[in-house]
A protein has these predicted regions:
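A conserved FAD-binding loop/helix module that cradles the flavin
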Residues: 1-47, 135-155
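Flexible, glycine-rich terminal cap/loop adjacent to redox cofactors
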Residues: 38-41, 45, 55-155
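Active-site-adjacent helical/loop segments in soluble small-molecule enzymes
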Residues: 52
Length: 155
């Protein structure tokens, strides 16, 4: 799990060491992880709901249950769950967790990018994405968009 973080930091250090003329800085560690257990992929990026509350953030969470392929009758379809944590005041994403099939890796990495770029729930609800029946949820039921909409409805 530390290799992902170390690799990102090493790219920055290497670029700075060799004076590559691009601004590179570490804006902090997101804490982004994924694992595979008996056919289910789990991922987490940023703060969990429990940690955010413990740290004193006023938050709103968006949660969505779905499937990782469309239609759900395709062979190998796995149930999915996505939870996104947002600041209640600003709507900026603070964290997210996912549970699903192999497509979970791309979803948790998108959440990590959203955290790093300080995206708001309104930006996530208008996210444009590529979908394919065997690779992703349906474009009408994309979990990041639906979780952002769920959070928005609670603000």
């Amino acid at each position: 799990m530390l290799a992902s973080t170390a690799t990102a930091e090493a790219r920055i250090a290497g670029a700075n060491l060799y004076q590559i003329k691009v601004v590179r800085e570490n804006k902090g560690t997101i804490a982004i992880y994924s694992t595979y257990i008996d056919g289910i992929v789990l991922g987490s990026a940023g703060l969990t709901e429990k940690t955010a509350r413990k740290e004193g953030f006023e938050i709103v969470c968006g949660v969505v249950d779905g499937v990782d392929k469309h239609p759900a009758t395709l062979p190998g379809t796995v149930k999915s769950k996505v939870k996104l944590i947002f600041s209640k005041q600003s709507g900026i994403i603070l964290g997210g967790q996912v549970s699903c099939g192999m497509s979970c890796a791309q979803v948790i990495n998108l959440i990590g990018i959203a955290i790093q770029k300080r995206m708001s729930l309104t930006e996530l609800e208008t996210l444009q994405m590529a979908t394919h029946p065997y690779l992703t949820s349906a474009p009408t039921a994309y979990p990041l968009v639906l979780a952002a909409l769920d959070a928005y409805s609670k603000m």
